[in-house]
Every structure is written in C-alpha cells, then in structure tokens.
Amino acid sequence: MATTTTPRLKTKYREEIAGKLREEFSYENVMQIPGLVKIVVNMGVGDAARDSKLIEGAIRDLTTITGQKPAVTKARKSIAQFKLREGQPIGAHVTLRGDRMWEFLDRTLSLALPRIRDFRGLSPKQFDGRGNYTFGLTEQVMFHEIDQDKIDRTRGMDITVVTTATNDAEGRALLRHLGFPFKEA
C-alpha cells in the first residue's frame, strides 16, 4: 500500500460521486456505477532509437512522477526508415491501480494541470467509445516532483484513464464529478 490513509479522491468518490452517478443514470445495481480501473502513463521516446541513454531519463522521470518503476516498451519489428531494430527500447509505461492510481489522479488534477501555461481545459472529444479517456501532456515539468534544473530534455506523455463505464456519456459524467476540467463545447 502506498499510504495508510484512504486517498482524498477515493473517499470523495465513495461518499459523494457514486451516489450522484446512481441518481443521474438511475442504476438498479450498485455494481453498475462506473468507477476507475487503472491509469496508464506512457512516455514514447522515439529518439532512443538513435541514442539509448535517452530512455534512462524517461524512466527516471516516470519513476519520480508515479512512484512506480516503469516497464520499458520495445520495438515489435524493425523499420528501416526510422533506423529502428526489433527489440530496441522506444518508450516506457506505468500502469497504476489502487491507492497509487487515486493519489496520482488527485495530484494531476489539483497540482499538475493548473500549472500548464494557457490551459483552457481538456478536450471532451478524446473518449474511445467505451468510457475510457486519453489525454496528452507536452512536458513533464508541470509535476512538482520533477526538479526543473535536473531535466535533460522536455518529454511529453500520454495518460489513459480506464473506467468501468459502458459508454462515453457515463465516462464523461464520472470524470467530470472527479474534477476533470473539460472545455465547454
């Protein structure tokens, strides 16, 4: 367990959000209420094909941000145009579940996203049709765990929030209640 106390966002979900969602969609069963399954944070490092030391920086940044050691993503097949060989490391990803997932989501929503310059909100169109939401961040500096003086280069990342929602409307409602700042369409 990452912490001894229940994460703030998890408590809010159990006490407030679950009830609101049950009323909003009039679910018969408690198990129908959408919830979070996992959060996958992916950092693609295409330049690592030319310089293998770049992957170490991505691993260090992801470990610092998520508190978990990332898995290295390797190329599945060789592509000559990209100077890529099969099995070469080209990225890193972390799958967060349980309390670590709730803590990471809380830090992302309350600390990291407000630190983005000219932030107007997340696009409400990036749902996949099954209630899961993916968004990208252009740099890792917005997380306060990263020391700005120690970064070797800016790296973006993709964050996928996997939910138990069956469609986009349920997923959007869940994430809005959790505090995702969606742009008004």
UniProtKB/Swiss-Prot annotation:
UniProt cross-references to NCBIfam families, sorted A to Z: PRK00010.1
TM ranges: none
Record bears the keyword Magnesium: no
Protein name in the entry: Large ribosomal subunit protein uL5
One Gene Ontology cellular component annotation held by this UniProt entry: cytosolic large ribosomal subunit
Biological function: This is one of the proteins that bind and probably mediate the attachment of the 5S RNA into the large ribosomal subunit, where it forms part of the central protuberance. In the 70S ribosome it contacts protein S13 of the 30S subunit (bridge B1b), connecting the 2 subunits; this bridge is implicated in subunit movement. Contacts the P site tRNA; the 5S rRNA and some of its associated proteins might help stabilize positioning of ribosome-bound tRNAs.
HAMAP family named in the record: Ribosomal_uL5_B
One GO BP: translation
Membership in a protein family: Belongs to the universal ribosomal protein uL5 family.
Oligomer and partners: Part of the 50S ribosomal subunit; part of the 5S rRNA/L5/L18/L25 subcomplex. Contacts the 5S rRNA and the P site tRNA. Forms a bridge to the 30S subunit in the 70S ribosome.
Annotated keywords: Ribonucleoprotein, Ribosomal protein, RNA-binding, rRNA-binding, tRNA-binding
GO molecular function, one term: RNA binding
